[in-house]
């Protein structure tokens, strides 16, 4: 049979981009440490959104481009037809190792007959149209599932294909169907020199691009690097092996330092040995330092701090110096009063660092607490040596004064004023100094003081009781007076309310009488108008009045007056009334 062409119904316009295999490494970039858009490394399908029928036509068109004499025919000779294929299948064959694709659409088909004995046409069977991958003699169809990438090699270079169908005409194309498909949501996709990293929210990633360290913050779009020396620093033994918590206050990666000073603290760094203080950033972003000679030292608290002296370090040193030291000698700082008595004290000091630059420059990180402890004990020892035990015990019961009058200042006030001046020179503000504990080390004197304390406590308790009783009686009297005032106020309010109610009632009655009078006046005016218009009504009304007047009277008629009575209008009143009513009706 003579070779026939593919019917025109299967022919579409040629597409220029037939060979889709390409490698990002063909492009050059000046700075390989910068992330590039994902679209620059992922080859997208330009007909992924077409209908299935249209996709089939495009696949056949591109797969068979350049073939002048098709190897298939839809008009097979008798006995040469292949078994029918379902409409969801392609037919695959090759002519002299040149692959060809055909869509039989469920109809009869076969390969063409060639009279040339050197031409070999082979039928390679049916291929499902939904097949993810099939290839023959350098021609490949790749269907990347939704939400996936396909990793392949072309010309020994890595390529990544996006979701949808692809037709690749490339004899060097290599793809492993078992491992080539990868989910797009994978946190890290590595394909030879192509690296795609997705940093989730709340995380950061440490990576190396050659010898250049990078700390990648979280963002919606993935980071894409094309570099054979790209490497992600993994965490051993962690579920998130690729990522670190972004809330970490300090993170170091190579020469990069990522610092987040919190409110109430500052970061201490040394740039080429020069102290630099980093404050809490106001923009809410971490501070990034990218210098191999700019080192992070520590965080220093600038908010209020409270320390108890002697400190633990001082106590340990006391034990080390004297293993036979008593608990008082270890836990208390011992001084001698003006009257040669030994007392032990514990100090509470509250302070804040207002100028970390000066404090660290003059004292260093470890020397701040030691300096405060030493000079506070020095000033307190000087004040105790100038005071008697009685003065110390008296002033210990009094809180530090708020005044600066020297005559009224306590020992604590004097020590605080001197200590505050000393610390201010070192960038430290003293907020409070208090003698937390004071103990007389002489046993006999301590007992006497304890007895005095008991007596004083009893007196204080009795005094407090009397004051309390006075307060109770005063409160009761005040409550009674307030109750009486409230009762009087309520009574006055009730009287006023009653008077107002009566006034309102009288007003309502007066208004009612006025309305009634107005109504009667209106009726009389209407009657007057009627009587003026119809005089007979006035006569009738007058007759009614006379009739009513005569109802209760008795009329005596004598025989001699009978004639006059018959001529009286009263005799004819009823007849007149009847006649008048008849005239009105007519």
Swiss-Prot record:
State whether keyword Coiled coil applies.
yes
Q: Name one GO cellular component term.
A: early phagosome
Write down the species. Dictyostelium discoideum (Social amoeba)
Query: Signal sequence: where?
Result: none
> What SUPFAM superfamilies would the database entry show?
Band 7/SPFH domain
Gene for this chain: vacC
Spell out the protein name for this chain.
Vacuolin-C
Coiled-coil positions: 472-526
* Family membership noted in the UniProt record: Belongs to the vacuolin family.
UniProt entry keywords in alphabetical sequence: Coiled coil
Q: Which GO terms describe its biological process?
A: establishment of protein localization to plasma membrane; phagocytosis, recognition; phagosome maturation; regulation of DNA-templated transcription; response to bacterium
């Amino acid at each position: 049979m003579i070779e026939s062409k593919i019917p025109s119904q299967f022919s579409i316009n040629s597409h220029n981009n037939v060979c889709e295999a390409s490698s990002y490494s063909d492009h050059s970039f000046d700075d390989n440490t910068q992330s590039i858009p994902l679209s620059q490394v992922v080859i997208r399908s330009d007909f992924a959104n077409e209908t299935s029928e249209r996709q089939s036509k495009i696949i056949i068109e591109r797969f068979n481009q350049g073939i002048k004499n098709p190897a298939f025919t839809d008009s097979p000779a008798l006995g040469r037809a292949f078994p029918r294929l379902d409409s969801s299948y392609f037919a695959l064959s090759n002519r002299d190792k040149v692959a060809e694709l055909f869509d039989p659409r469920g109809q009869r088909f076969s390969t063409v007959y060639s009279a040339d004995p050197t031409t070999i046409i082979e039928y390679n069977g049916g291929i499902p149209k939904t097949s993810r991958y099939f290839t023959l003699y350098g021609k490949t169809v790749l269907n990347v599932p939704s939400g996936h990438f396909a990793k392949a090699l072309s010309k020994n270079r890595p390529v990544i294909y996006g979701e949808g169908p692809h037709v690749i005409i490339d004899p060097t194309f290599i793809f492993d169907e078992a491992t080539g498909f990868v989910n797009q949501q994978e946190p890290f996709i590595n394909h030879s020199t192509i690296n795609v990293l997705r940093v989730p929210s709340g995380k950061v990633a440490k990576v190396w691009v050659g010898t250049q360290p990078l700390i990648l913050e979280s963002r919606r779009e993935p980071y894409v690097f094309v570099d054979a020396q790209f490497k992600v620093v993994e965490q051993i033994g962690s579920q998130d092996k690729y990522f670190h918590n972004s809330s970490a206050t300090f993170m170091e990666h190579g020469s990069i330092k990522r610092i987040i000073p919190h409110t109430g603290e500052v970061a201490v760094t040394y740039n080429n040995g020069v102290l630099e203080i980093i404050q809490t950033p106001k923009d809410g972003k971490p501070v990034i330092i990218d210098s191999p000679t700019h080192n992070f030292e520590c965080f220093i608290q600038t908010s209020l701090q409270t320390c108890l002296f002697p400190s633990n370090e001082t106590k340990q040193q006391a034990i080390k110096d004297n293993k036979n030291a008593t608990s008082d000698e270890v836990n208390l700082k011992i001084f001698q009063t003006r009257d040669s008595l030994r007392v032990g004290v514990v100090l509470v000091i509250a302070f804040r660092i207002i100028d970390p630059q000066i404090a660290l420059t003059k004292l260093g990180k470890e020397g701040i607490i030691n300096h405060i402890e030493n000079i506070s004990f020095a000033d307190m020892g000087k004040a105790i040596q100038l005071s008697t035990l009685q003065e110390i015990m008296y002033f210990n019961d009094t809180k530090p004064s708020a005044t600066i009058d020297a005559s009224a200042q306590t020992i604590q006030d004097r020590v605080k004023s001197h200590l505050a001046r000393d610390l201010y020179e070192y960038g430290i503000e003293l907020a409070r100094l208090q003698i937390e504990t004071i103990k007389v080390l002489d046993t006999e004197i301590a007992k006497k003081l304890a007895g005095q304390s008991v007596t004083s406590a009893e007196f204080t308790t009795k005094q407090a009781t009397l004051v309390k009783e006075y307060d109770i009686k005063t409160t009761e009297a005040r409550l009674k007076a307030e109750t009486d005032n409230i009762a009087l106020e309520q009574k006055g309010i009730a009287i006023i309310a009653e008077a107002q109610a009566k006034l309102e009632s009288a007003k309502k009655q007066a208004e009612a009488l006025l309305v009634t009078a107005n109504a009667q006046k209106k009726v009389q005016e209407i009657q007057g108008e009627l009587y003026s218009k119809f005089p007979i009504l006035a006569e009738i009304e007058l007759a009614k009045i006379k009739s009513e007047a005569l109802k209760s009277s008795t009329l005596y008629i004598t025989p001699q007056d009978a004639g006059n009575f018959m001529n009286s209008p009263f005799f004819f009143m009823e007849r007149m009334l009847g006649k008048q009513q008849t005239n009105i009706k007519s």
